[in-house]
Amino acid sequence: MIKLIVGLGNPGAEYTATRHNAGFWLIDQLAREAGTTLRDERRFHGFYAKARLYGEEVHLLEPMTYMNRSGQSVVALAHFFKILPDQILVAHDELDLPPGTVKLKLGGGSGGHNGLKDISAHLSTQQYWRLRIGIGHPRDLIPDSARAGAKPDVANFVLKPPRKEEQDLIDASIERALAVMPVVVKGELERAMMQLHRNP
């Protein structure tokens, strides 16, 4: 059963619309669905709400520590409520998936994502659930003729807003993720994966 859903992003208005904040976008939607409001909770170093989602009690969290210190926030809440790593779902932007794609998985490496890297370090395990929201990779924007030897600027890419057509695809993928949340919060993760991965 999933007891904590974390969305990753950076605090501050200048980051709100950037690709790196896709995890925050999902949490904002979940809070709206639950009819609750995230509030600044200093002991958890983030914005937090206890929500009733689809008949289950779930903690929602947006760390306000900046991305590379997300683990500080996650572990503070997990320890306080005695939540185990495999009861945690972390929603984050995923460079290795195109916009419009969303995938669910348990464990694995960080794939260069500093938020995941810090969470794994603080939890002392990689065995927590991830909801990977595809944002695409900057290399995909380089013409084939210019790709040889090109070094895409990933840091700049994730800290910029998506183009409108990309945003529409990302929004649609978040809607698909929301559609499987009733199954996710009940702990039927394999079923949720089958439903989610049937679609691109």
From Swiss-Prot:
EC number(s) reported in the record: 3.1.1.29
Entry function: Hydrolyzes ribosome-free peptidyl-tRNAs (with 1 or more amino acids incorporated), which drop off the ribosome during protein synthesis, or as a result of ribosome stalling. Catalyzes the release of premature peptidyl moieties from peptidyl-tRNA molecules trapped in stalled 50S ribosomal subunits, and thus maintains levels of free tRNAs and 50S ribosomes.
GO biological process: one example: rescue of stalled ribosome
UniProt cross-references to PANTHER family, sorted A to Z: PEPTIDYL-TRNA HYDROLASE
Site residues, Discriminates between blocked and unblocked aminoacyl-tRNA: 10
Protein name, UniProt field: Peptidyl-tRNA hydrolase
Active site: 20 (proton acceptor)
